[in-house]
From Swiss-Prot:
Pfam families: Cecropin
Record-given protein name: Cecropin-C type 1
Domain of life: Eukaryota
Stretch forming the signal peptide: 1-23
PANTHER family (UniProt xref): CECROPIN-A1-RELATED
A Gene Ontology BP annotation from the UniProt entry: antibacterial humoral response
Upregulation: By bacterial infection.
Protein species of origin: Aedes albopictus
Record's function text: Cecropins have lytic and antibacterial activity against several Gram-positive and Gram-negative bacteria.
This protein's GO CC annotations: extracellular space
Length: 59
């Protein structure tokens, strides 16, 4: 039982230390996700007033 907890902690520490060298790829992925999030937010920002107006007309 304790072995699994210790193993998980060691594995997490190893991933954090090794993951530092892979920051370039992760940064690119993060930028892509951020851009997609911005596009979704902007589209929702434009569409929500239209949807709210259509609901008000339907009442």
């Amino acid at each position: 039982m304790n072995f699994t907890k210790i193993f998980v902690l060691i594995a997490m520490a190893a991933l954090l230390l090794v993951g530092q060298s892979e920051a370039g790829g992760l940064k690119k992925l993060g930028k892509k996700l951020e851009g997609a999030g911005k596009r979704v937010f902007n589209a929702a920002e434009k569409a929500l007033p239209v949807v709210a107006g259509a609901k008000a007309l339907g009442k």
